[in-house]
Amino acid sequence: MTSFELSSPDVFTAGTVGPPGQRVFYLQVRDDNLVITIRCEKQQVAALADYFDGLLDDLEPSPYELATADLELTEPIVPIWTVGPIGVAYDDPDDKIVVVLEELVLDDEEGEADEPDEPDPEAEAGASVKVRLSRAQVSGFVGRARELVSSGRPPCRFCGLPVDPSGHPCPRMN
């Protein structure tokens, strides 16, 4: 697979396809005519937003303009792979947040993710996408991600599990 390194992408966003309860989550990076779409999990989008939010709070205050780019996914939505590990760092001299999205590499025999503490020298390394984001882009991502995560199925008031439009088997009401 091909890896990408973008030092100043136009857009870094998240989005979904499908109705609540059946949504598929994606991360997307756009730079000029290049569109990179990666499939991910809802929890990864939420965790990335939480981490970004904390990182922005921890940084020295710096004036930055809010991102004004369109944060909707650009079609066609064709993921190049599914994201596995995600790394985030702060580049102080350039005042950039560096995000590394690594491809989820599955073990060929069992279809399960390889254990990171048991490297296989014969295993093929997965691809990655490395982006350097401005504070404005990160702030825009946080707002977009929170909107997406909260727009899912409402939680059951008794057990907290998601409730489908047709209801759900609540273990606390059984």
Specify the residue positions occupied by each region the protein language model found.
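The feature marks the first
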Residues: M1-D58
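Residues in flexible loops and secondary-structure boundaries
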Residues: P20-Q22, V35, A46, K96, ...
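Short, structured motif recognition centered on aromatic/hydrophobic residues
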Residues: R23-Q28, L48, F52, I97-V99, ...
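A generic structural micro-environment signature
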Residues: F12, G18-P20, Q44-A46, D94, ...
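Short, well-structured hydrophobic secondary-structure segments
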Residues: V35-A89
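Mixed-charge, glycine-accented linear interaction segment located at domain edges/termini
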Residues: L106-G167, P171
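Intrinsic, low-complexity N-terminal interaction/targeting segments
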Residues: M1-Y26, L66-S128
